[in-house]
Structure formats: structure tokens, C-alpha cells
Amino acid sequence: MAQIDFRKKINWHRRYRSPQGVKTEHEILRIFESDRGRIINSPAIRRLQQKTQVFPLERNAAVRTRLTHSMEVQQVGRYIAKEILSRLKELKLLEAYGLDELTGPFESIVEMSCLMHDIGNPPFGHFGEAAINDWFRQRLHPEDAESQPLTDDRCSVAALRLRDGEEPLNELRRKIRQDLCHFEGNAQGIRLVHTLMRMNLTWAQVGGILKYTRPAWWRGETPETHHYLMKKPGYYLSEEAYIARLRKELNLALYSRFPLTWIMEAADDISYCVADLEDAVEKRIFTVEQLYHHLHEAWGQHEKGSLFSLVVENAWEKSRSNSLSRSTEDQFFMYLRVNTLNKLVPYAAQRFIDNLPAIFAGTFNHALLEDASECSDLLKLYKNVAVKHVFSHPDVEQLELQGYRVISGLLEIYRPLLSLSLSDFTELVEKERVKRFPIESRLFNKLSTRHRLAYVEAVSKLPSDSPEFPLWEYYYRCRLLQDYISGMTDLYAWDEYRRLMAVEQ
């Protein structure tokens, strides 16, 4: 096992215009303060205020959006980071681990990773992801990419259909089709901060949001040693070279994770479990009394000093005492949140320290709060009650189905841009309006300038005389559409769908 030295991980250099020379502790902290400013002031963060947490298109400001959720995760992440550093200081290990002059950057990287963790999520959350992937699967049929004979391939895009005698190109076709059918919010977050927004964050800060290490084009079995780290796509083919450079800069082995990402993940797990239940009460899906009984029933028999007793029952009893002039709901969730944090944060911090050799190496194949402990059971309890009584509620399911239809409908509306030939689309990009393509011209001009420029830049770097050019061009054209639609807020996507379907009231 390599020696633990966080100076080799907290890399303050950037991809472009990187600071040069040796830096003092204060100068390094200023570099990460610059990251904070870039992130907090980015439009992608502002858009989170109109993206779904659980309840799409919610008008009640007391119910969480992606932004308010991310701010809560940021605070919990800061709490865990401080707890870790405090315990390492007590153990006199800060200097031994190269952290004595990097405590500020350590905390800042965790906080900003937490704030950004949902930055790539599409409108309507996981149902938006599913809509994008299903729509592309119905046209690209990635499962046919291994088909024999090749005539069985049902891909509707000629450039990406497998052909006899073109095995090197066929392998690229397989990768592209697989990649495009595995849109994922975390992978889109990497693409957003590097390719689309050009935020030029430090290597360490980007490493903090590389939650999953599996490429989106992966087709084989995941290694048992990395099955958790690779359970979802973490980056796209379009960012392959950037991620390879990131791994080099952060001393990460293939498919390994940046150490501070485990803290961000734990903060998210702690935050959303309680928040989803609180939002459900705010939405009148159930009362606090009903929630308590759901939790009690799901946990089962327990001893007086059990974690359930110390966290949930304690919150319930204190909220019923009415010692404060606040509603039972407010008191219950205040105590539930405080009790949960006071138990889970120290536990997550100690798990991080206990497993630091594997975490530092990037190979710890678990979440900090997924084990055989009571703390893990408590999180599972919150999640299971939410799944059974919140996510399956008819109002929630109806909104999710509407969201799925909106995203599918928008992709269908913009489909003509994907149906144009390479030469015709190139002409449209150059001229912006082509008389013989009135519909396509209007659709193209509705795309955001940022996304169009990202497409142009990517295609301009391709060798136009290469037999791979038509494949890559189509890939980036699909990315253009995915970038545009996934970047919409819930409300904008809803309104845009109604406008373009001519159903606006």
C-alpha cells in the first residue's frame, strides 16, 4: 500500500492557465477560493433552484429543490470533513498524512464537491435520465452491437450500423452507441464543468465529483474489486482524454476514485434521507404521526438504548413535549435531523479514517455508510420508508410520468436535426439558416450558443479525411441535443414542450 500523503492528491493545478511555481499555504488556499467563486457564480448552480429533488414543478418554496438540497449536503460535507481533520489532529496524524497545511483546501474541496454533486442532473431527475436513455436505445439498439450476422443490427442511424469488413470502425460504432444510451447525471456533471462551462477548476476539485469510475461505453463485466465504484457510468467518451489526464494528475489507478469523493457521497446519503421525509410531510403525503408509525413499524422490535431509540424515538418524544412554541412537525424534524447528524457524521468520519489506506488508493469498494452497522440500518430505514410511502404516491408517480413524457417529447421534436445528412447539417451549422430546411433551421437556432460552440469545437478538432469522421460527428451531434435538453430546468422543459406541441394555454 502506498504511503498516505495528501499533497500528492490535493493538486491545485488547472487544465488551462495553471498557477506555476511553489506556493505557500495561503496561496494554495486562495487557488481553491477561486474554485469556490467559479462554482458558486456559475449558471449551472443557479439552475438547480428550478430542478427537482423529489416533487417536480413544485410551487411550495418550503419543499426542496436541487439547489437547497445541495446546500444542505454542502453543510453536512463540511461537518464530516472537519470531524475527520479534528480526529486526525488528535491522533497527531495531520503532518504524517501531509495535511497540516492543507486543512483549508481539504474542507473546500469537500464543500464544493457537495454543492456540485447534482449539477449534471437533467430535468425531472432520474425519470429525465431514463427518458433520454430509452429514446436513444430505441434508435441505436446498443444490444445489437454484438449481433451476428451483422444484418440483424436494428440501428436506425446508417453511420453507426455495423458493416462487414469494417471491424476497427465497428468497434468505435459499438462504443458510441453504448455511450449515447448511458446518459447519467454524474457523467454529465464532469462534461458540464470541463467541456461546456469551461470552468477550469483545479484537478483536485474535479476529482471530487468523479463519483463513479466506469466509462459510459463500458460493455463487459465490471471487476469484482471495483463493482461498487463502477456501478454507474462516470464519464463519457467525449471526456475520455480529460479523465485520463485527471487520473495522471491525481495519481489515480484505472477505475479508482479520488479520496474526498467518499465524504461527498456520505454527506448526500445523510442529507437526502431525512429531507425526502420532511418534504413528504410538507406536501401532506402523510402526517408526522403517520411517519413515526411507518418508521417504527419498519424498524421492528428494539431495545431502549438502540440507535432507533436514541434518534427517532428521542425526536418524537421531544417534539410531543411542546416545550417550544413551534409546531410538532418543525420540532420533530429539527430533532430528527440533529440526532441523525450527531450519530452518522462521527461514524462516517471514523469509517473514513479506519479505511484510509484503501480510500487514499481509491480502491475502497463501498460507501462509508453502507455496512452491517446500526448507522447503515438507520439510513436504509429512511430510504425504505421513502420508497414505500413517498416515491410510490400517486401524485409523485403522475408527475414523474409527465416528466418522462416531456423529455421524450422534446427529443422527438428535435429529432429532425439528427436526421440530416452530415453535409446538410454542416451547412446548417455554418449558415445557421438554410432555406430548404425551414424546420431544422428554426430548431437549430433554438439551441443555446454554449452547446452549439461545444459541438463546433469538438468537430473542428477531428481529421475530416478520416473514415471515423462521420461517426464522431454524429456522436457530437447527439451530445449537442443531450446537452441542451439536460441543461433545461424542469419548468423550462415543461413550458418548451407545451409551446412546441402547440398546447400552450
Curated annotation (Swiss-Prot):
It comes from the Bacteria. Its cofactor is Mg(2+). dGTPase preferentially hydrolyzes dGTP over the other canonical NTPs. GO terms for biological process: dGTP catabolic process. Residues 66-273 form the HD domain. Pfam families: HD. Signal peptide: none annotated. Belongs to the dGTPase family. Type 1 subfamily. Keywords: Hydrolase, Magnesium. The gene is dgt. Its EC number is 3.1.5.1. It comes from Escherichia coli O17:K52:H18 (strain UMN026 / ExPEC). Homotetramer. This is Deoxyguanosinetriphosphate triphosphohydrolase. SMART domains: HDc. It catalyses: dGTP + H2O = 2'-deoxyguanosine + triphosphate + H(+). GO terms for molecular function: dGTPase activity; magnesium ion binding.
